[in-house]
């Protein structure tokens, strides 16, 4: 069963194939990031704050190419809050001013109040630079795997172990 490991050349080929898969995935991610002009072109909805528009586990595709274009009320955006790692998906409900320095107020469709409590300390509004991208497409529930992996860390270990086992046992 592990006879493939006895041959160093075959083991090296398997290791290189695994590295090729990882580097291809990374290059695809970076390519999509450049095309969409977004550091995170694909995000997963982590909470129910945007229901019924988006459910927990929906996979969202972002577009940020029109940085100079006006952001409009009603647009669903993903933004980062200074000091927090997790991006937030919410709708723009109010806009004050025009251009890149316009002040934007967001709110989740399923939330009672706006997002001022979520913003960084001393921040009352968002500006265009806080926005990672606007949602232009989504796939329902596909991102639920990400949620399961973050809520159950042992699943990561099991999946990585299975992937490693497949690479080791793979025959050319």
From Swiss-Prot:
Gene Ontology cellular-component terms listed: signal peptidase complex
GO annotation, biological process: protein targeting to ER; signal peptide processing
GO terms of molecular function: peptidase activity; serine-type endopeptidase activity
Positions of the catalytic residues: 49, 90, 115
Residue intervals annotated with topology Cytoplasmic: 1-14
Membrane topology: Single-pass type II membrane protein
Residues bearing attached sugar chains per UniProt: 111
Stretches the record annotates as C-terminal short (CTS) helix: 158-169
Transmembrane segments: 15-35
Enzyme Commission number(s): 3.4.21.89
Stretches assigned to the Lumenal side: 36-172
Main location: endoplasmic reticulum
Keywords from the UniProt entry: Endoplasmic reticulum, Glycoprotein, Hydrolase, Membrane, Protease, Signal-anchor, Transmembrane, Transmembrane helix
SUPFAM superfamilies noted in UniProt: LexA/Signal peptidase
Keyword flag Hydrolase: yes
Location(s) in or outside the cell: Endoplasmic reticulum membrane
Enzyme class: hydrolase
Family: Belongs to the peptidase S26B family.
PANTHER family: SIGNAL PEPTIDASE COMPLEX CATALYTIC SUBUNIT SEC11
UniProt note: domains: The C-terminal short (CTS) helix is essential for catalytic activity. It may be accommodated as a transmembrane helix in the thinned membrane environment of the complex, similarly to the signal peptide in the complex substrates.
Quaternary structure, from the entry: Component of the signal peptidase complex (SPC) composed of a catalytic subunit SEC11 and three accessory subunits SPC1, SPC2 and SPC3. The complex induces a local thinning of the ER membrane which is used to measure the length of the signal peptide (SP) h-region of protein substrates. This ensures the selectivity of the complex towards h-regions shorter than 18-20 amino acids. SPC associates with the translocon complex.
Name recorded for this polypeptide: Signal peptidase complex catalytic subunit sec11
